[in-house]
Each structure stands twice: as structure tokens, then as C-alpha cells.
């Protein structure tokens, strides 16, 4: 009976697909065209800047201050190195799968269902969606806190409403508008971080009004690895591991921004590899060098930093970058950096709303969510998905009646662990994809290849599993246990499990993943190759264009 039910479920899915499809000819090949399809309007330069700019938010500019104060500069730096490796591996896995099969409306959810299991895709898909909801809420909350650095004239709820309306509008019209907005937001963030790193070098060598050569002063006298919660070597390890977990928020669900945009990108087989292959250099420069700069210019025991964290201070007041600049007695820059932080929070909220709406849109296309979420307006935007994501992002209004810092930390914890679970699912899908491609003698035909596989994936899976299971370990250390912190740290795990089991019960498909020989690695490839022919590579006419085409 169970097998019959599972067969009926699969047949109903195929029947729905048939009623939603018409065929058009592209390059002489019949290609599926879904009604209400998104449109490929994002260009290479949009994808390149989304790859790095969309994820640079409050985690790096503000959230790093908490990790610095608790763990010390060396722990902060090493935590960013470790998380950069994790992100690089996840990006490579997604890049290979997406470049091989860049279907319209495809997402990580598509590949998890195709290569692993429909139930895992269901759980991962909804996990993606509510993680992005939390991220939109957290970035909007952060932006409202940043504005309060200048004025309290408008209530917090007012700023949250204005910012939610702004990102909703940017995500409701041409996707090109979203791409252009993120392009310029990202340029501002990149220029700011480059400037801050250069300024950090100047401060390091004493080129400030005080002429005080800092060097690695704040790494000495036992401050490099600070004791946290408990004393001695155990305390230093607790501090280090706490920094690793907290640093995850600065990166969380960043690789997926590129993959969610792939279905709306011109020439995805050319532009997605370009974005993913250069991601490692951006990680090294912006995140690793950025965290090193923070540890050089700001002491983990700085009174301003500690007071800002304990009081839930707003924006630049809690940014270790700004505190280091103020200590160097450089005027005005604190307001400039606060403006950059505000831009970053708005930009990240905008990007996360885009990804969240595409998550539920992709779920609907995979028949894992109501059909209404597949509806796209005449500009190719899934407006129902956007509206529902914005509606739930109104959780940010909790900030109007609770401590901003407390609510911000709740959202950080929930979204971070959801992101870790999503990455585990992606890497499992990649290993299945790899095995199926090898079995079908197609492994060497994939258009984009990444190094150190599958070993990097196995190591990253181990790290992610360890981080996920221990993310709330500090509540068990010393006398710091609180029910709120415990729930925030681990509530995502039972939610994910309930989603997975519920789908198994509904579909009556009790297999734990597809057998390798059952995995389809050919359907859709001809369409992808035909699509590639529609977008010939641009030929540079001069040295300036050659440089620009390399960058973007």
C-alpha cells in the first residue's frame, strides 16, 4: 500500500508538470517554458557584485565586535579563516551543480530533490525560507538600530516599516532593478572595506594624528586568545569555539545568493563559474583581512566596545572599526562608517528578501509549496512569494517592544543554524551528484571543475556537523544556562526533523535517499547547452574593456 501511495504521489507530480508546461524551440531544441516564468535579466556585473556584496552586512561591521570582546583578536581571525574555508567549499559545490544544470527557477532545493530525496528537499527548502525571513528581519532590525545613532525622532517601529517597504518595492518590479541596486550598494561596501583595511595599515604603522604605532599591541599579554566563561586553557578554547560559531552569521547563506540569481542570469554557464571561482579571493581580502584589521586597531578590552555591547548601543557605536578609528582620533569617519553600515544592512536585507522569495518560488515549482507561489507578474517577479516573505519578516517589529540587542541575537542564532543545516544538505547533494556523474561517465564533461574534491566536502561536512551540534555549548559551560538561549540555539533542529518526517508521512516514500543509479543527470542538459549558445561571450575591443570583462 505504501509503494502504491508513493507511486501515486510521483504520478501526480508529473501530471502537474505536464499541465504547467508548453514547449518552445530554442536553438532547434524543444525547451520547457513554465507559465509565470522568471526572466533572465541579470548581467555578469550584477552577479559578480551580488557574489560578495550581498552578504556583507552587519555581521562583519558590527557583529564582529562581540566575538572580539569575548574571544580576542587571534580567535576572531582564525574563526574567519575557518568559516571562509567552509563557505568556499559550499560555493564550489553549488557552483558545479548549478553550472552543469542552470535551469530557470532552479535553486539549491532543486538539486537536493534531484540528487538526494524529495523529503530532504522539502525540509531544506522551508528551512531556507524561514532562515531568509529571519535574516531579513535581523538586517532590518540592525538598520533601525544604526539610524538611532543619529536620531530618536522616529520610533523604531517606524524605521522598520519604512525599510521593509523599501526592500519590498525593490523586489517587486524588474529583477534588473534589484541587480542594479545591489550592484551600487556592493560597490559602496567594497570601497568602504578596502578603505578600512588601508586605514588599518596606516594605524598599524602609526600614521595617525597621535603618531601611535600600534603594531600587534592588542595581541600581547594574553589578549590574543581571551578566556571566556571559564578560566585557563579551557576558557581560551571556549572563547575560540564561540568565535567560530558567531562568525558564521557574517557568512550565512552567502553562496546561495549567486545560485538563486542563476535562474535569472544571462549566460549562467559563463557567469556563474566566473563568480564562484573568484569568490575565494574576495573571502580572503574582505573577510580575513577585515577581521585581521579589527584585531589590530581595536582592543578586545576597549571600554567603548564593552560599553556598547553591554548597553546594546546602535550602529557605529558598536562597530570595532569605528571604535578603532575614534581611538586614533580621526574625526568625522564615524558618521561615514555608520552610513556605510546602514547601506550594508539595507543591501543585505534586500538580497535576503530576493533569496527568500526565490526559495518559496522554487518550492512551488518542485510541488513542495502551494501553486500560488509560482505566480510571476509581467516583469517576471514572483510577487506572491515576495509578499509572503515580507509579511513574515514583520517579526522585526518585535524590536519595538523588546531590547534590540536581544531580538537581534535571537534572529542571528536562528538564521545561522538554519544556514548550517542548509549547507549540510547541499554538500550531501553534491556528493550524490558526483557519484551519479562518475557512474554515467559524465564527470569530466561538467563545464566547471573545482579543486580538492571530494576531500574538501567531507572535511566541511564534519566541521558543519560539529558546529551545528555545539552551537549552543556555552549555555552548558559555567553557570550561564538560560532556557531562552538554549531554545534559540537548538529549536531549528527539531523543526527541520518535523518537516522531514511530515513529508515522509505524506508522500509515503520511506527510502532514505535515491540510489545512485536512479539519479537523473541528463534531463535538462540539452536545454542548458542551447541556452549557452544564445549568449555568446563578449569580445573586448580595447584594453579597458578587457580589464572590465575580467572584473565583471
UniProtKB/Swiss-Prot annotation:
Molecular function via GO: amino acid transmembrane transporter activity; L-proline transmembrane transporter activity
Tagged with keyword Membrane: yes
User: Key word tRNA processing present in the record?
Assistant: no
> Any ranges marked Extracellular in the topology annotation, and which?
70-73, 139-149, 206-239, 300-335, 400-410, 479-480
Gene3D superfamilies referenced in this protein's UniProt entry, alphabetically: Amino acid/polyamine transporter I
- How the protein sits in the membrane? Multi-pass membrane protein
Record-linked Pfam families: AA_permease
Question: Which domain of life does the UniProt lineage start with?
Answer: Eukaryota
UniProt GO BP: amino acid transmembrane transport; proline import across plasma membrane
**Keywords of the record:** Amino-acid transport, Endoplasmic reticulum, Golgi apparatus, Membrane, Transmembrane, Transmembrane helix, Transport
One GO cellular component term of this record is:
Golgi apparatus
Coiled-coil ranges (or none): none
Q: Kindly list the residue ranges recorded as spanning the membrane.
A: 49-69, 74-94, 118-138, 150-170, 185-205, 240-260, 279-299, 336-356, 379-399, 411-431, 458-478, 481-501
What are the boundaries of the signal sequence? none
Where does this protein reside within or beyond the cell? Golgi apparatus; Endoplasmic reticulum; Membrane
Cytoplasmic domain ranges by topology: 1-48, 95-117, 171-184, 261-278, 357-378, 432-457, 502-552
Reported function: Required for high-affinity proline transport. May be responsible for proline recognition and probably also for proline translocation across the plasma membrane. Also functions as a non-specific GABA permease. Can also transport alanine and glycine.
Q: Which family does it belong to?
A: Belongs to the amino acid-polyamine-organocation (APC) superfamily. YAT (TC 2.A.3.10) family.
- State what protein this is by name: Probable proline-specific permease put4
Amino acid at each position: 500500500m505504501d509503494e502504491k501511495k508513493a507511486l501515486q504521489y510521483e504520478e501526480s507530480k508529473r501530471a502537474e508538470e505536464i499541465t504547467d508546461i508548453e514547449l518552445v524551440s530554442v536553438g532547434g531544441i524543444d525547451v520547457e517554458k513554465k507559465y509565470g516564468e522568471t526572466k533572465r535579466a541579470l548581467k555578469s556585473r550584477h552577479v559578480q557584485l551580488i557574489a560578495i556584496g550581498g552578504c556583507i552586512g552587519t555581521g562583519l561591521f558590527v557583529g564582529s565586535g562581540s566575538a572580539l570582546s569575548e574571544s580576542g583578536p587571534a580567535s576572531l581571525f582564525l574563526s574567519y579563516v575557518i568559516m571562509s574555508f567552509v563557505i568556499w567549499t559550499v560555493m564550489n559545490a553549488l557552483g558545479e551543480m548549478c553550472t552543469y544544470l542552470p535551469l530557470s527557477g532552479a535553486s539549491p532545493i532543486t538539486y537536493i530533490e534531484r540528487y538526494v530525496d524529495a523529503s530532504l528537499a522539502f525540509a531544506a527548502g522551508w528551512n531556507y525560507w524561514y532562515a531568509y525571513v529571519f535574516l531579513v528581519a535581523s538586517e532590518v532590525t540592525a538598520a533601525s538600530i544604526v539610524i538611532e545613532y543619529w536620531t530618536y525622532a522616529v520610533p523604531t517601529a517606524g524605521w522598520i516599516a519604512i525599510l521593509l517597504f523599501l526592500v519590498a518595492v525593490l523586489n517587486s518590479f524588474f529583477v534588473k532593478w534589484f541587480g542594479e541596486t545591489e550592484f551600487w550598494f556592493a560597490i559602496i561596501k567594497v570601497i568602504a572595506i578596502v578603505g578600512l583595511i588601508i586605514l588599518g595599515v596606516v594605524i598599524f604603522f602609526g600614521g595617525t594624528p597621535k603618531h601611535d604605532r600600534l603594531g600587534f599591541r592588542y595581541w600581547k599579554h594574553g589578549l590574543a586568545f581571551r578566556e571566556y566563561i571559564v578560566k585557563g586553557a579551557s576558557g581560551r578554547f571556549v572563547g575560540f569555539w564561540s568565535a567560530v560559531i558567531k562568525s558564521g552569521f557574517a557568512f550565512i547563506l552567502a553562496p546561495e545568493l549567486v545560485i538563486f540569481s542563476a535562474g535569472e542570469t544571462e549566460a549562467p554557464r559563463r557567469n556563474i563559474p566566473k563568480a564562484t571561482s573568484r569568490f575565494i579571493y574576495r573571502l580572503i581580502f574582505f573577510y580575513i583581512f577585515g577581521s585581521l584589521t579589527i584585531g589590530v586597531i581595536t582592543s578586545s578590552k576597549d571600554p567603548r566596545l564593552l560599553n556598547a555591547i553591554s548597553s546594546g548601543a546602535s550602529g557605529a557605536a558598536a562597530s570595532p572599526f569605528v571604535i578603532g578609528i575614534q581611538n586614533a582620533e580621526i574625526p568625522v569617519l564615524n558618521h561615514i562608517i555608520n552610513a556605510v553600515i546602514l547601506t550594508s544592512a539595507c543591501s543585505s536585507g534586500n538580497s535576503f528578501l530576493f533569496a527568500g522569495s526565490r526559495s518559496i518560488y522554487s518550492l512551488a515549482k518542485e510541488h513542495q509549496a502551494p501553486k500560488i507561489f509560482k505566480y510571476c507578474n509581467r516583469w517576471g517577479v514572483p510577487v506572491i512569494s515576495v509578499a509572503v516573505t515580507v509579511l513574515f519578516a514583520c517579526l522585526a517589529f518585535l524590536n519595538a517592544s523588546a531590547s534590540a540587542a536581544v531580538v537581534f541575537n535571537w534572529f542571528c542564532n536562528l538564521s545561522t543554524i538554519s544556514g548550517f543545516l542548509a549547507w549540510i544538505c547541499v554538500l550531501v547533494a553534491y556528493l550524490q551528484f558526483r557519484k551519479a556523474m562518475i557512474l554515467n561517465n559524465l564527470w569530466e564533461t561538467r563545464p566547471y571543475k573545482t579543486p580538492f574534491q571530494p576531500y574538501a566536502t567531507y572535511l566541511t561536512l564534519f566541521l558543519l556537523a560539529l558546529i551545528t551540534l555545539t552551537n549552543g555549548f556555552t549555555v552548558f559551560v559555567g553557570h550561564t544556562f538560560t532556557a531562552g538561549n538554549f531554545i534559540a540555539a537548538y529549536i531549528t533542529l527539531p523543526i527541520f526533523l518535523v518537516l522531514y518526517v511530515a513529508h515522509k508521512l505524506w508522500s509515503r516514500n520511506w527510502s532514505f535517499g535515491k540510489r545512485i543509479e536512479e539519479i537523473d543527470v541528463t534531463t535538462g542538459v540539452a536545454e542548458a547547452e542551447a541556452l549557452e549558445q544564445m549568449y555568446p561571450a563578449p569580445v573586448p575591443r580595447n584594453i579597458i574593456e578587457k580589464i572590465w570583462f575580467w572584473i565583471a
